[in-house]
Amino acid sequence: MKTPKGLTEVKKGLCSFLILLLAVTLLAGLVTGCSSSTTASKEQVITIGVDTPLTGGAAPWGLSEMHGVTLAADDFNSAGGLTIGDTHYTLKVEALDDAYDTAKATNNINQMAYTDGVKFMFTFQTEGSLALAPTLTNMKILNFTVVNDDRIIAQPADAYTYRTYMGFSVQANDYLAWMKKTYPNDKSIAVLTTNDTNGNVTEASTKAAAAAAGLTYLAPVFYDTGTADFSPFVTKILNEKPDIILTIGDPTGDVGLIAKTLNGMGFKGIHATGIVGAADLLKIAGQAPIEGMLTLNMPLISGGQVSSAVLGLPAREVAHSGSAWGTAYCCTWDFYSEAGIMFDAMKQAKSVDPTVVKAKIDQSGAKFNYAAINNGIATFGSPASNAIFGANGGHQVTNSWPIDIIKNGKDTIGTIITPK
């Protein structure tokens, strides 16, 4: 049977239309499929918890930590955050003040874990961090800490807490060996430190390192947290006639007062301490008492190994809006770099699940950006850390670190130590 000519034309036109519609539909599907991994339809903010001393003698460290983590989070967000599937993730920082008090630190960590739902955390205070490390593991909360006590390392292999500060037990041998080589006429060392867990770790590590370096180790002097007058303790330690006095691990405010007291009592030897900046010490003690001091701070001097990102941090601290900003602190570079390790691990893992991020950190040979140093790399577990901690060495970061000499009231690089 013949089909009328008009009907044939209609059928042809309809077929052409259907083919065109199918092609457009397929093309749209292809475009949608290609963009689903890069275009997010959902936004989610991940809270990064920080428990640290924002007031009290250790506040310069705590404010440095809050600033460093916040600025690293800002940079993570500015670089595009992290898109996984149809969700775009950015970071925000929640910082709580523990005033370097164990009870406050414990309450803060519990609040962030149980009430605020934080899954990524930075902690500072020794006893609180130690006490709650098992809880954080049970709750699968990834925690980076700067606790000096090596018990934070002596955890099960599945622990979720990592020390991202080169603990003094790792640094002690190189620090004292460098002093011995650089100041060959100095033969003896004594420790003036806090009467707590942190102080005990400092004392034990120094004693072992002194023996390895060939330095005479004198009796340590301990003082209670909150001490305002250091005259009795300085008098006691000077009676031993040490060439080197070590105050590593002591709060910044205490180090400044000790330096001032040592100078007032005529000490002419070497005062060596930890991550304390010349600018903070200058405010407390003045220039003369801190001249020649050794610290583990990173001098923000251009033209060397220090990265441009870190060199720009002080100006960003001053310009940043909000309470507790407007001042640049000594150790912001360190906490900025530590936070960068965590955030780089998130990106490499392509996940905001702490379990997945932890697996990336634990991966053999994994390397992460260490922002303080040009082309800086950080790893967890190395010959240096494994030699001290054995199977637990994977919970200790290994990276290059500076020895700083204060000259004319300013930080200068004495040397950069690269762990073997």
Regions found by a protein language model. Name each.
Residues G49-T70, L96-T102, Q125-E127, L192-V201, ...:
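Extracytoplasmic "Venus flytrap"
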Residues T39-V45, P60-S64, L82-Q155, T164, ...:
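Beta-alpha junction/loop-to-helix N-cap segments that form part of ligand/metal-binding clefts
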Residues A103, V118-P220, K268-I301:
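Extracytoplasmic ligand/sensor domains, especially the bilobed periplasmic-binding protein
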Residues M1-T47, S78, I84, I417-K420:
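Short, low-complexity disordered leader/linker segments with a strong preference
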Residues W61-I84, A204-A210:
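Short, polar/charged alpha-helical segment
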Residues H320-T332, F343-K410:
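Segments of small-molecule ligand-sensing domains
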Residues V50, M112-Q125, F144-V146, I189-T193, ...:
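Periplasmic-binding protein-like
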Residues A259-Y336, K347, I417-P419:
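Extracellular/periplasmic periplasmic-binding protein-like sensory domains
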